[in-house]
Amino acid sequence: MITEFIKSFLLFFFLPFFLSMPMIFATLGEFTDDQTHHYSTLPSCDLLLIRGEVKENARCFLHNPKISHQHHSFWSLIEGCLEALQFGLLAILQGLFSQFAWEACSCTFACMLLTSERTEPSYPFSEITEVSRGGLHFVKLN
């Protein structure tokens, strides 16, 4: 029983940290600005997984007041990425029957797992639809 407890503790304590590492390194040094928001681009989500269905031509953005091109540090970037990951995990745990929860966690993990490149968005923000929950912005092209 103690062994199972230790395994569970290690899984839930260290797994989010290791899963967030690609987001942390993808976020460093890459910033896009429009008139009202500061966006830190996560890896390009050319293949975005929504409820098990692959959607093409989508982009995911992490928006966090701690992350802007005016003042940022390595630790604030890590904190913002961990918050994004935490939100994705909570969406999985708390909202399995919610359409947005599937989109949220899929977007979070698609950015981390489905792509390895970093690209600046080349589309005007007027052509993008945003869904925002908990400080995390999920941006999908129309």
Curated annotation (Swiss-Prot):
Q: Which residues form the signal peptide?
A: 1-26
Annotated keywords: Signal
Name a GO CC annotation attached to this entry.
endoplasmic reticulum
Q: What is this protein called?
A: Uncharacterized protein C1105.13c
The scientific name of the source species is Schizosaccharomyces pombe (strain 972 / ATCC 24843)
Q: What is the lineage of its organism?
A: Eukaryota, Fungi, Dikarya, Ascomycota, Taphrinomycotina
